[in-house]
């Protein structure tokens, strides 16, 4: 069991970065015994919202735009990929158009947290956005698959930075108590981009060329760059020279981390699609990567890492550990639902990809207000545990309802079930990061947010691999029983069911064969949704690990917005 009092007292050095004793001694203590100057109930209720000028709102719009764009480009290739491969070729390399982006975005997130602490928030954010725009231009102009993959990797490196820094900047300029409201806006835009990517890709491919799925980022990204340059003006320590700053980067730790995570991601990308899960080509990179992650954590806690990318004290209290676990499972469930509701729409209802994109709007249109409600409640109550319990419970109900869907389900059923699920999952969106940061000092904001972003992204990777394996395995079991044609059974067996769960494939079959195939897909999806309940249940259990920590209502950070220079008397 984690030690609460001793670990929290030694977690930070109170002499550094102006950390107040209150934030150290009260870390992760029960509310009833928190050693604050006010009672917890007073802290929760007597908080007046800070007044914010137009510069704050301009900054919020700027970082929201950057987050929306990078999230949109993260999923936009899922629908456009067949057209891209048809034009550029590339054979088996096509998978790296998706995986290259995913690998770069996931593996680089902790490093961006450290860069934000060393160089401030402004230039890493501008650099990441510029890299993303450059990568988009390379992708749009690619004449072969190798160039496209290189552009996607650049996009991923840029997206990694914008994701981490968007959340970090909000934490810098908004007190902990109010953060969930504004995180609901920013992260809601990120979620919106993630969900709408395939829909926009379908429209673009249908009415134009796939290249505009990438060229679209140029004017939008350019506008985001101009806005960020104009409005992202936050404080940071400028006294240290460049050579000293570069020398403080945890080069060895970051290299070890990137290598370990890449190994895990390679294993997951091959599992169930290129090789069977039991293949040594899958198991070896998975085991090597997991061992590498363990070695990375040992290194980060050693004397060889004086300025670690992921300080171990981030995991030194049960609240932060509980929130990290919840974040991992929330990442799994989020992508699980976004990827497998379209399988139902296309593989069971027979919808086209573009119509499927419209049908899943029920999730999007419900999750955004749900995030707003979660953020409002957290700010109003100054509590997160009741929200987490309620959110996971409703998420479990929604996932369970999905298992009832079949080819005869009404529109009201699949719309209503999405709304129920989204109300639960949506309230978690803005309330996990503030809960993670509650027991930590403000000096840990960037590293904490970066680690949290990585855990969420890492969960999303598993959220595609696990349900695909469940779906394919169940289809292999059902096909001999439900499909009459041996040739048709061979089409979907051996891990190929997921890739065939499309309206295009169903359209090539006779009516009788199509009904048999829909039955296989429907029953396989039912199993997939039932398995998802286990992961959401573990998220609910993790909520019991966290403790309620009083949420600070004042900022104590070195990276807040720069004060406006007063006008001279002659100008007044």
From Swiss-Prot:
Compositional bias ranges of the Basic and acidic residues kind: 1-15
UniProt keywords, alphabetically: Glycoprotein, Membrane, Transmembrane, Transmembrane helix, Transport, Virulence
Database matches in InterPro entries: MFS (IPR011701), MFS_dom (IPR020846), MFS_trans_sf (IPR036259)
Gene Ontology molecular functions: transmembrane transporter activity
Domain of life: Eukaryota
Location of this chain's protein in the cell: Membrane
Any Pfam family hit: MFS_1
SUPFAM superfamilies: MFS general substrate transporter
Residues with glycosylation annotation: 23, 317
Disordered as annotated region, ranges: 1-46
Biased composition (Low complexity): 29-39
One GO location term (cellular component): plasma membrane
Transmembrane annotation, as ranges: 56-76, 88-108, 123-143, 156-176, 185-205, 212-232, 255-275, 282-302, 321-341, 358-378, 386-406, 419-439, 451-471, 529-549
Membrane topology reported for the UniProt record: Multi-pass membrane protein
Position of the signal peptide: none
Similarity comment text for this entry: Belongs to the major facilitator superfamily.
PANTHER family, sorted: MAJOR FACILITATOR SUPERFAMILY, MAJOR FACILITATOR SUPERFAMILY (MFS) PROFILE DOMAIN-CONTAINING PROTEIN
Function description: MFS-type transporter; part of the gene cluster that mediates the biosynthesis of pyrrocidines, fungal natural products containing a macrocyclic para-cyclophane connected to a decahydrofluorene ring system that show potent antibiotic activities toward Gram-negative bacteria.
Protein name (database record): MFS-type transporter pydD
Native source organism of the sequence: Acremonium sp
Gene name per UniProt: pydD
